[in-house]
UniProtKB/Swiss-Prot annotation:
Protein name as catalogued: Probable terminase, ATPase subunit
Keyword Nucleotide-binding carried by entry: yes
Species in which this protein is naturally found: Haemophilus phage HP1 (strain HP1c1)
Family indicated by similarity: To phage P2 protein P.
Any one Pfam family match given in the protein's UniProt record, by short name: Terminase_6N
Keywords, comma-separated and alphabetical: ATP-binding, Nucleotide-binding, Viral genome packaging, Viral release from host cell
GO molecular function (one): ATP binding
Segment forming the signal sequence: none
Keyword Translocase part of the UniProt annotation: no
Matching InterPro entries: ATPase_terminase-su_N, P-loop_NTPase, Terminase_6C
Length: 607
């Protein structure tokens, strides 16, 4: 009884909003330590207690363990400035992901063939290879760097057995010169193509080149390949590029760097619909695979119909400029879902939605009903049903927006883990309140202080279903960490309560913004000007910022006398809240402000 009272007394210290926020992060696969740090709790013990009391673990158990691992891999992959511990955790998760898939294959083989029974005696973490009898002999010999001479096709069979139907179908169409695959999120495409390339490099000696939208995604390819080589073949791969003992090279390149066109080999282009300079990417990828023997494989979730990649997917770039091709029909979307088709331009196209993945055997990995509840129909269709965004009426250009995404590791004056992340440099805050139960957003913008600098979004925060008091306290904590000279708050409606509370501790910085057609137009034009002239940057890992901007459209008011800007409201883009939070921060900027140019000085020699 005493213990019960003690627990109750401890719980009462925290508002329901704090517990709700902890639950939200818990289900996103944050660790108790990370949740405590995120919410400013003194201890992680309440997290363990709440998880047990409110059965949060049961909610997680409804999802497959592989799905949970995949979610955590995504969370860590997108995290900037990862600590050594987080890097080790990411590598361990990839290791575990491969082991689970291998165990699943072994289970299937055990049921379907008695010959697989022998593998049941081996631990899932230390499973023997097909030729394990030679293992001790190999250890006695001097190891050759990246030696794959002992690998046989039979050793690949456990992996092949673990594939889902749609992955096997992609594998059976490996012979096509160009494969173009539009896919749902989290269906194991990176995982599969990593092994396909490794297998091909081992047995053919051909070079393999991975082109990814970011350095972090390229690292995922490499990590998968290193772990697979160790797990399936007992080989420790090192180097960048990785050069196998048979001479095959595996290159891992990001498109935000100066990619060398001197490399040649089979090309894998990852998430091509989100690459900022797609035309350059296409030129480089094609140049690397110019030789007749090289294959090209492109796969991505869809982005915008106005992104250059859409014409690559639709075949419009093949039709362009040739009257004879103008009316050549391409397979329908339904046909591409139905096993894929070889198209008139020579590309084999294939669509794998989450529904197709479930039918193909991945039903244990996903709970599609939970995903439909989590996302709006608009967001669900884009992320999981392979539907391109139609942003014809948007005031923003998707190509310009993608250029704003950068690798923030280059910002040497910003350390998000420090007590004072930006030192004493001036920053501006912007707050967009929650609407109808959706999330509130807060962003921190660093205005340029030196010639050549741009506006930078240092950080963003989203708070779901929380009270004014909680949100104001979160802003207070950030206010104490940064030299925040301005906090723009949408005080038109529900945000007024937050403004009143923030004003108590930041009277000079807090600024109430009353939304009307004139004020909204001014703020939107300021942000539009920054994007158009490439004067604003944010982390390239913040993938939902671009869709948030693309939702902003120009239309007349109900009276028809005034033009204003509106956003199509969806759950995934949080009512375009990150866009309006940025607007509220940039409101501090004058429309007439121009970027400070770098001055060039020279000394005249009068002699």
């Amino acid at each position: 009884m005493a213990e019960h009272k003690l627990r109750k007394r401890k719980t009462s210290r925290y508002d329901d909003e704090v517990i709700y926020a902890a639950k939200f992060l818990y289900l996103k696969k944050y660790t108790p330590k990370e949740i405590a740090e995120e919410l400013g709790l003194n201890s992680r013990r309440p997290i363990y207690y709440w998880a047990e009391k409110y059965n949060w673990r049961n909610l997680l158990s409804e999802s497959g363990i592989e799905e949970l691992i995949a979610l955590r891999i995504i969370t860590l992959t997108e995290r900037e400035n990862k600590s050594d511990q987080e890097i080790k955790e990411l590598e361990a998760l990839i290791d575990k992901d491969i082991q689970y898939k291998k165990q699943r294959a072994a289970t299937v083989a055990k049921v379907t063939a008695k010959s697989a029974v022998n593998s049941a005696d081996v631990s899932g973490n230390e499973r023997a290879f097909a030729d394990s009898g030679d293992g001790d002999e190999r250890k006695k010999k001097k190891r050759v760097k990246n030696d794959i001479s002992h690998v046989t096709p039979e050793m690949c069979q456990p992996f092949i057995d673990s594939l889902f139907d749609y992955q096997k179908h992609i594998r059976s169409n490996k012979h096509h010169d160009v494969r173009n695959i539009l896919k749902s999120r989290q269906i194991g495409a990176t995982y599969y193509f990593s092994f396909e390339a490794l297998e091909d490099a081992i047995f053919s000696g051909d070079n393999q080149i991975f082109l990814s939208a970011s350095k972090r995604q390229a690292e995922i390819f490499k990590n998968y390949i290193v772990k697979m080589a160790r797990e399936y073949f007992g080989v420790e791969l090192t180097g960048n590029p990785i050069i196998l003992s048979n001479g095959a090279e595996l290159h891992f390149l990001s498109t935000n760097k100066n990619t060398s066109q001197g490399n040649s080999g089979h090309v894998y282009g990852d998430e091509y619909a989100w690459i900022r300079d797609f035309q350059r990417f296409d030129d480089v990828a094609s140049a690397m695979a110019t030789h007749e023997k090289w294959r090209e494989t492109y796969f991505s979730t869809p982005s915008s119909k106005f992104h250059e990649s859409y014409s690559f997917w639709s075949g419009d770039n093949w039709r362009d400029g040739d009257p004879k091709r103008k009316n050549v029909p391409f397979p329908t979307f339904a046909e591409l879902r139905d096993g894929g088709r070889l198209c008139p331009d020579g590309q084999w196209r294939y669509v794998v939605t989450i529904e197709d993945a479930l039918k193909g055997g991945a039903d244990k990995l996903f709970n599609i009903e939970k995903l439909k509840q989590r996302y709006s129909k608009y967001a669900f269709n884009q992320l999981y049903m392979c539907i391109w965004i139609d942003d014809a009426d948007s005031i923003f250009n998707v190509k310009q927006l993608l250029k704003c995404g950068v690798d923030i590791a280059k910002w040497k004056d910003f350390n998000p883990k420090a007590d004072r992340p930006f030192g004493d440099r001036e920053v501006w805050g912007g707050f967009d309140p929650a609407h109808s139960g959706d999330g509130a957003s807060f962003v921190i913008i660093a205005p340029p202080a030196l010639p050549g600098e741009k506006y930078r979004m240092l950080a963003r925060y989203q708070w779901h279903g929380l009270s004014y008091v909680y949100q104001a306290n979160q802003i207070r904590a950030l206010y104490e960490k940064y030299n925040m000279t301005y906090i723009g708050i949408d005080a038109t409606g529900v945000g007024y309560g937050v403004y009143e509370l923030v004003k108590e501790f930041a009277r000079r910085a807090a600024t109430a913004i009353i939304y009307n057609p004139e004020s909204k137009t001014g703020m939107v034009l300021k942000v539009h000007d920054l994007v158009e002239h490439g004067q604003i940057e944010w982390s390239e890992s913040e993938l939902d910022i671009v869709p948030s901007f693309l939702m902003i459209k120009h239309q007349s008011t109900k009276s028809g006398n005034t033009m204003t800007f509106t956003a199509e409201r969806t759950v995934k883009t949080q009512h375009a809240d990150v866009f309006f939070a940025i607007c509220n921060a940039i409101n501090k900027k004058s429309l007439s402000d121009k970027p400070r140019k770098r001055r060039r000085w020279s000394v005249l020699n009068e002699n």
